[in-house]
């Protein structure tokens, strides 16, 4: 769920720095520490090089990621041209929604724009956590609600705002994002 939040620093023991980032994120969402520890056990650290794909068109998305470092581009190919639909960075979840939830081939590509570090969790683990961990289920539902709201806002903005107005909104809501994108 691509939403950035400020960090809070809490002593989470001797975890890997990337795992601490995810734990801090979950703490900021109000999940209890015991639930967070059992949730984050299911995540694995993955390094991606610039240009490496997290999801490729035609392949089924088996993993959801949490970005601890780096930028990612969501795009479609149309007539051989890349059409970027979204760019996201640290402290955001990363997934091809339709492919992940339907477990069907993806229509989009998600590619690292910079060297990146992500934490990944397999689809089966997400489904298991939804059944076994009430705190995760509550987080999952809230995240999906926020995603639906964000998608509705995007749809509305595409209809009622000009390209210039959408660009100004991007500058207002994500002032650092454009500076981070490599040219």
Residue ranges and their predicted role:
Residues 9-17, 52-62, 89, 128-131:
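Short N-terminal helix-initiation segments at or just after the protein's N-terminus
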Residues 9-44, 99:
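Cyclic nucleotide-binding regulatory module and flanking cytosolic helices
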Residues 25-26, 36, 81-83, 97-101, ...:
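Short, flexible segments with low predicted structural confidence
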Residues 27, 52-114:
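Cyclic nucleotide-binding regulatory domains
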Residues 46-48, 148:
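Short, flexible turn/loop "capping" segments at secondary-structure junctions
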Residues 111-183:
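Polybasic "coupling" helices that flank or enter modular domains
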């Amino acid at each position: 769920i691509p939403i950035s939040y400020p960090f809070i620093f809490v002593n989470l023991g001797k975890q890997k720095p990337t795992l601490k980032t995810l734990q801090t994120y979950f703490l900021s969402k109000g999940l209890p520490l015991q639930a967070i520890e059992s949730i984050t056990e299911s995540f694995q650290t993955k390094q991606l090089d610039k240009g490496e794909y997290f999801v490729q068109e035609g392949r089924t998305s088996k993993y959801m990621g949490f970005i601890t470092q780096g930028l990612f581009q969501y795009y479609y190919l149309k007539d051989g041209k890349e059409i970027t639909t979204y760019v996201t960075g640290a402290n955001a979840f990363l997934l091809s929604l339709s492919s992940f939830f339907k477990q069907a081939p993806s229509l989009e590509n998600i590619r690292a724009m910079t060297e990146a570090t992500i934490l990944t969790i397999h689809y089966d683990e997400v489904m298991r956590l939804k059944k076994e961990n009430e705190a995760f289920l509550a987080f999952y539902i809230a995240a999906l609600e926020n995603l639906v709201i964000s998608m509705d806002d995007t749809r509305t903005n595409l209809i009622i705002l000009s390209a210039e107005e959408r660009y100004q909104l991007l500058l207002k809501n994500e002032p650092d994002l454009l500076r981070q994108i490599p040219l």
